[in-house]
Swiss-Prot record:
Disulfide links within the chain: 30-50, 36-55, 40-57
Tissue expression per record: Expressed by the venom gland.
Written domain comment of the UniProt record: Has the structural arrangement of an alpha-helix connected to antiparallel beta-sheets by disulfide bonds (CS-alpha/beta).
Species: Scorpiops margerisonae
Gene Ontology molecular functions: potassium channel regulator activity; toxin activity
Protein function: inhibits Kv1.3/KCNA3 channel (1 uM of the toxin inhibits currents by 64.1%).
Highest classification ranks of the organism: Eukaryota, Metazoa, Ecdysozoa, Arthropoda, Chelicerata
Superkingdom field: Eukaryota
Localization, UniProt: Secreted
Any one GO cellular component localisation term in the record: extracellular region
Signal peptide annotation: 1-24
Name this polypeptide is given: Potassium channel toxin alpha-KTx 30.1
Keyword DNA damage carried by entry: no
Recorded family membership: Belongs to the short scorpion toxin superfamily. Potassium channel inhibitor family. Alpha-KTx 30 subfamily.
InterPro entries named in the record: Scorpion_toxin-like_sf
């Protein structure tokens, strides 16, 4: 295969990992969903969740929610 393709894959992977690291710096770390309730209270119509060790505020766009 062309070496340019492998270079592109390596560079794209590096960019994704860098973006993930930068994006995670402003997130609140958590161990359970209860840790995220205060963090998500700044938004409306969201449900707090602890995903991957960080708080996520999930918005239901339809479907089944509990």
């Amino acid at each position: 295969m062309n070496t340019g393709f492998f270079f592109f894959v390596i560079m794209a992977t590096g960019l994704v990992l860098t973006f993930d690291t930068i994006h995670a710096e402003d997130k609140l770390k958590c161990t359970k969903t209860d840790d995220c309730a205060k963090y998500c209270s700044q938004f409306t119509d969201v449900h707090p969740a602890c995903l991957g060790g960080y708080c996520e505020c999930l918005r239901w766009e339809g479907g089944i929610s509990s």
